[in-house]
Design a protein with these regions (language model features):
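Acidic, glycine-enriched catalytic cores built around paired aspartates
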Residues: 1-177
Length: 177
């Protein structure tokens, strides 16, 4: 970071590196992956396990551990629950709750690690595929090894109400958190 420190007037004037007190406003970002899958999974669990009581917690865990092998009926039930990206208030609210929880937690860590701000970046790149390959099955119906949703987009194939519904879902989370 010495080279980067040379690019900041504060560091140059104080003769200190960025992380040695040279910069006036030090901030950071944290890239997150799987937010949509997490929200869709929590929506499915809430609906099927707790509200409708169609699947027990033990049945769900068994199906997830088996990567849905021998549990296709459960997988299809999970897939059919409301998903983010369709302008569905319950699914979109779950994503908002996940997003706010992650953002608030990360923001609260700023002081602990000596930053003036610490923000979440919901990233869009090919890492969703890599992360999916390294992640076991999820309660949204995604099998182990399948790609996760890319950034703040719906999971592949789950946005079935068209582009306007997707855009309506996309703008619901606050960009100011």
């Amino acid at each position: 970071y010495l080279y980067m420190s040379l690019l900041y007037d504060d560091c140059f004037e104080k003769g200190k590196g960025m992380f040695a007190g040279g910069i006036r406003y030090l901030s950071g970002t944290l890239e997150t992956y799987g937010n949509t899958n997490t929200a869709d999974s929590l929506t499915a669990i809430k609906e099927l396990v707790y509200e409708k009581k169609i699947i027990s917690k033990d049945e769900l865990l068994k199906a997830l551990d088996a990567n849905f092998i021998g549990n296709e009926k459960i997988r299809q039930q999970l897939i059919k629950t409301p998903k983010y990206g369709n302008d569905n208030d319950s699914a979109d609210k779950m994503l908002i709750d996940v997003h706010e929880h992650v953002c608030n937690y990360v923001r609260d860590q700023a002081e602990r690690v000596g930053l003036q701000s610490f923000l979440v970046v919901v990233i869009n790149n090919s890492a969703n595929t890599l992360m999916g390959h390294q992640t076991s099955a999820s309660a949204d119906g995604r099998k182990s090894g399948e790609p996760m949703a890319n950034g703040n987009n719906p999971s592949g194939g789950s946005d079935v109400n068209g582009p306007t519904a997707f855009l309506n879902s996309l703008v619901k989370p606050s960009p100011y958190i």
